[in-house]
């Protein structure tokens, strides 16, 4: 049986996954492959909201590798707040307007799936795992992304997050 701490950390993996999904750029509206502009290093910060109503600052760094005619993506992302830190790996594919993929976090033996659709510079995405489901709203303008995450699970330790990412130079 999972402890509350382990469950909270697994849910945080969903928040990290949201950061990754947030970098899917504005290329959809222009008919370009969504991963086209992702290759490279990204970083950002924001806040997470805990179930007790408190907020913590969070910082993240991500590395993106775009593969196979820019329709596949490999990701490694590291994030840390006062009470969380983790190293997430993920893979995604873009086909016929849909983004699908998988993620894993080996230190906590956690894994799950992602799915979503793009509408211009706005994305509505769902991340799932055995211990959580999270709704994600993503907006991209140029080299900046804003991410709003809301857990769909009432018992989660992390209720949501608001994060901004920017591509490194």
Predicted feature descriptions by range:
Residues 31-139, 150-169:
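Central antiparallel beta-sheet cores of small beta-barrel/beta-sandwich binding domains
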Residues 145-148:
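Preference for long, well-ordered alpha-helical segments
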Residues 13-23:
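Bacterial N-terminal signal peptides
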Residues 2-14:
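Bacterial N-terminal signal peptides that target proteins for export
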Residues 24-29:
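Sec/Tat signal peptide C-region and signal peptidase I cleavage site
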